[in-house]
Amino acid sequence: MQIFVKTLTGKTITLEVEASDTIENVKAKIQDKEGIPPDQQRLIFAGKQLEDGRTLSDYNIQKESTLHLVLRLRGGMQIFVKTLTGKTITLEVEASDTIENVKAKIQDKEGIPPDQQRLIFAGKQLEDGRTLSDYNIQKESTLHLVLRLRGGMQIFVKTLTGKTITLEVEASDTIENVKAKIQDKEGIPPDQQRLIFAGKQLEDGRTLSDYNIQKESTLHLVLRLRGGMQIFVKTLTGKTITLEVEASDTIENVKAKIQDKEGIPPDQQRLIFAGKQLEDGRTLSDYNIQKESTLHLVVRLRGGMQIFVKTLTGKTITLEVEASDTIENVKAKIQDKEGIPPDQQRLIFAGKQLEDGRTLSDYNIQKESTLHLVLRLRGGMQIFVKTLTGKTITLEVEASDTIENVKAKIQDKEGIPPDQQRLIFAGKQLEDGRTLSDYNIQKESTLHLVLRLRGGF
């Protein structure tokens, strides 16, 4: 049968062989054709180097298969190239080879176009025109191959030490793949890595797109330390943060981990355990803090204060503000926390809609005041609700809102429980389960609110 032998220069040789021929026989045929001594030949098939004593049929080499011929150069050397999948490729090179040559050899072995290859050695990306000796790459050195993916993207991974790693990924990569890439770059075993995005720990089997991680997103890397332990930190808002620590960590270290997770500067953090405020220079073991202990975090505000923002869904957000903050600033903080664009936010306090240019102190909003957040819905509309006292309330609604939703909005604005509200439109009492569009209620329609008094009829 015929087989083909392709050299690194791109030349293809055709050989007549039998399935029972040994690799040694094949090398002798190549020597006959090309004059290359067998001891300088290495034959590769399906990514495997072929051994002299084995036959073509041992390797399932059939007619018209293509082998790759790599020359074992006198005065040359072997180097290794490790891919992000953990596969290691062996290359025959000379110190005078350029990075471009090396990429061509990788293409020959693996089929990866040079323009998709990035080679890393000692943490440095290697430039095409430089040679291996320029980078002091010696025999049996290991290079790392990162694919510059078409349709790929870059993301950043920030460690607790503040170091930022750049990774080439695709949206379809699993978290497991990402951890393998981090291992490749940093040497940290995947089982010691915890990746956090938007406050959530990422699960190995899920993909980046599952978590809506897009190009240039930043993940946070927390090490799950062997011999380490987990502790919990509870904030005044009731949120619980999980930290990976060691008993030898100082309180200062713990505050740095909290900053990394929550963005709260250490100088604004006070940590309490067993009723004691913890001092920066002491360790967790000094205070006998053991695995799964819970610390309490109190935020020491710079001349600031906490306020609460309650949404129509009943969720309460805690914000750190100053009395001099404008309503615009407050909306920006809400956007940071909740992702709601300021132009969709309406803030209500004491029944008044707050104007962007005014400050909290203008409205006498003090510490621990509660604002109400109403969304100004795109594709939404305003309607009016008139009470028997003659007061008119403005609501932001959508035609698909149920009467129940509308009553919840009225409760949010006016504090009147839904079960005390009766809404009338066009002389009809409106039923909870129906929508505004069911009743043909359009923008700027006026509903009438009648109170159903407790104990009344």
Curated annotation (Swiss-Prot):
Name the major location.
cytoplasm
Entry-linked Pfam families:
ubiquitin
Keyword annotations for this protein? Answer: Cytoplasm, Isopeptide bond, Nucleus, Repeat, Ubl conjugation
Give the CC-aspect GO terms. cytoplasm; nucleus
The residues joined by the cross-link Glycyl lysine isopeptide (Lys-Gly) (interchain with G-Cter in ubiquitin) are: K48
Q: Which Gene3D superfamilies match?
A: Phosphatidylinositol 3-kinase Catalytic Subunit, Chain A, domain 1
Instruction: Give the subcellular location.
Output: Cytoplasm; Nucleus
Propeptide segment residues:
457
Q: Where is this cross-link: Glycyl lysine isopeptide (Gly-Lys) (interchain with K-? in acceptor proteins)?
A: G76
Instruction: Pinpoint the Ubiquitin-like domain residues.
Output: 1-76, 77-152, 153-228, 229-304, 305-380, 381-456
Q: Which SUPFAM superfamilies match?
A: Ubiquitin-like
Q: What else is known?
A: For the sake of clarity sequence features are annotated only for the first chain, and are not repeated for each of the following chains.
Q: According to its UniProt record, which protein family does this protein belong to?
A: Belongs to the ubiquitin family.
Function comment:
Ubiquitin exists either covalently attached to another protein, or free (unanchored). When covalently bound, it is conjugated to target proteins via an isopeptide bond either as a monomer (monoubiquitin), a polymer linked via different Lys residues of the ubiquitin (polyubiquitin chains) or a linear polymer linked via the initiator Met of the ubiquitin (linear polyubiquitin chains). Polyubiquitin chains, when attached to a target protein, have different functions depending on the Lys residue of the ubiquitin that is linked: Lys-48-linked is involved in protein degradation via the proteasome.
Under what name is this protein listed? Polyubiquitin
